[in-house]
Amino acid sequence: MNDILDKIIDSDVLVFASPVYYYSITGTLKNFIDRTYAKYNKIKNKDFYFIASSADPSNESIDSALETVKGFLRCVDNVNLKGIVYGTNLNDAGEAKYSDSLKQAYELEKNV
């Protein structure tokens, strides 16, 4: 984990991505965020992007998951949320390629 944390500290951009289950990010991503605690005070001056997908047709579950991510961002110095890409109403594998979220991700990528 120290190697990964050192790469995060040295990076200019962070991108977190997660499917949304039960109005939250996955346990794997949450565990990863929690494991950054050992060096969280060295994670600073970054642009941050969040990518999420949800079966929920509304934005409610995405908004709830985003609150967890924003909690992490409030604890690190000068990490700026630059973009969010999310897809809703995605129930089956491959559906995202037909949604607007893929276009959003492509446009956002141009600015990274």
Regions found by a protein language model. Give the residues of each.
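Helix-loop-strand module that forms the ligand-binding subsite of alpha/beta enzymes
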Residues: 1-76
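Glycine-rich phosphate/pyrophosphate-binding loop and the adjoining helix
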Residues: 70-112
